[in-house]
Amino acid sequence: MSSLTSAVAAVITDAAGRVLLCQLRQGHRLWCLPGGRIRQAESPMHAAVRDIREETGLETHMVDLLGIYQLTGDACGEDLPDVLMHVFRAEIDGGEPSVNSPGRISRLSWHDPDMLPEPMTPTARAAIADAVAGRSGVLREVQRDKEPELPDADDADAEQPAAALAR
């Protein structure tokens, strides 16, 4: 491991048990949990609240630490740093989900944990499975996917963000 990046994410569910996911705008347009990098001198909990607000417009609080996931391996031949991701369970205190970081996120939508969209980041996949199983305090190493499937561009842009949130 040549370098390590620290990041945060959160599993946020609605009253129906659906999980809020973000679709990345760049690269393979992977689905992921809301979150981002931890800034210098910032606590993981503060970073999670800040990043969720910046990406989704939601005010949240962290309920518990779902786990710490170390993302390792190369992605499609790229030499990327390992990522140490603190993943929390979070509850919404206020606001309506909306894309607040259009340069980073193309859309937000709620998904049933049994019918998750693809392609998805391996960390999100593992964390959602752990959340559904009722686990907390998980310590897990997760390998990057070598070749994520690419969504069809027409399908990826067909659904408007507001319609996706209404599901």
Where are these regions (language model features)?
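Conserved N-terminal beta-strand and adjoining loop/helix that marks the start
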Residues: 1-19, 37
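Residue-level preference for beta-strand/loop junctions
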Residues: 4, 29, 82-84
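Short, well-ordered beta-strand micro-motif
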Residues: 12, 87-91, 109-112
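The catalytic Nudix box helix
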Residues: 33-66, 88
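Active-site-adjacent beta-strand/loop module that shapes the phosphate/pyrophosphate-binding cleft
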Residues: 71-97, 130-135
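NUDIX/MutT-family hydrolases
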Residues: 99-133, 164
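Charged phosphate-binding loop/patch that engages nucleotide di/tri-phosphates or the phosphate backbone
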Residues: 129-167
